[in-house]
Each structure stands twice: as C-alpha cells, then as structure tokens.
Amino acid sequence: SDVYKRQTLERAIEGLKCETAVHICYGYGIKANTDWKKTLGSEWRQYEEAFPKLQKSSIDIVSLECHNSRVPMDLIELIRGKKVMVGAIDVASNTLETPEEVANTLRKALQFVDADKLYPCTNCGMAPLPRHVARGKLQALSAGAEIVRRELSNPY
C-alpha cells in the first residue's frame, strides 16, 4: 500500500542526521531494461502518483532521470521545495552529450526547481560505460552546468 511505502522510506532514514536522498531509477541500458521501457508508452507518468507522497516525506533530495527520459519534466512541480538532482546525462548510451544539451535539460528543470535546489547530475551510475565515455559525459555535465551558472549569475 502507499502508506506502507512511505513508512518504509521514513524508516530507512530514521535517526539520520545528514541530508537524505532517494533516487528513482528506470534502470541501466541493458537489453532487459530497454525492452521493458519500450512497453511503458510515450510518456512515463508514474511519477504523478509518487511525487505527492515524496513531497510529504522527510526525504531532503530527490534524484531523477531527466535526459532522454520519457518522464514529463513538468511533473517536477509536484515536488517543488525539495532539492532535486536533475539527471542531465543518459547512462544507457555511449553517445556523449554536448554541454548545450546538458544546459537545455537544466534550463527545462529550472522552470520547476529553484536554482538553489537544483543539483546537476547523471541519470544514474555509469558503471556499465567504458571509462573514456564516462569521463567525456562528466566533462559535458560540468561544462553544461557552467553555462547555466553563468546565465543565472549574469541574466543580461
């Protein structure tokens, strides 16, 4: 039940004195996951149900897959006020994002997340990726985040 899920999440962080985070994952780019994702339709609206519950939880940070995800970005509005790790790097592909692609993902998220609560990150872990690909993706993440930081600090 939904009450049980929230109680389980609260119990997991009980007594912790640090910031807490939950990562909502659609899985790595392995064949079983990519096949499953194809069955989910053109929009993944499951967050519509989960986000209001997360909004009421004691969790401080919500980590989301945003780049190349089919989750509508506007659903992030349902967790406004939480810190949000915005996944701007697709870990299910060896294709390197450009800094501008990263910046575009972050700009979209900024419509629903206050700038001081947005944490640019990857969609998930990069363990399955070749090291040179992971390094290139992290460089794009850093450069894309820097583009947006400059825009926010100098809006003219």
Q: Would you name each region that the model predicts?
A:
Residues 47-155:
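Catalytic-face loop-and-helix region of soluble metabolic enzyme cores
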Residues 18-31:
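Aromatic-lined carbohydrate-recognition surfaces of secreted/lumenal glycan-active proteins
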Residues 31-34, 129:
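Short, solvent-exposed polar/charged micro-motifs at secondary-structure junctions
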Residues 2-4:
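Short, small-residue-biased leader/transition segments that mark boundaries at the very start
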Residues 33-45, 93-98:
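Active-site mouth loops of central-metabolism enzymes
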Residues 9-12, 75:
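Intrinsically disordered, low-complexity boundary segments flanking structured domains
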Residues 6-9, 36, 40-43, 51, ...:
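Structured aminoacyl-transfer and RNA-binding surfaces used for tRNA recognition/handling
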Residues 11, 15-21, 41, 60, ...:
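A contiguous, surface-oriented mixed alpha/beta subdomain in the mid-to-C-terminal portion of proteins
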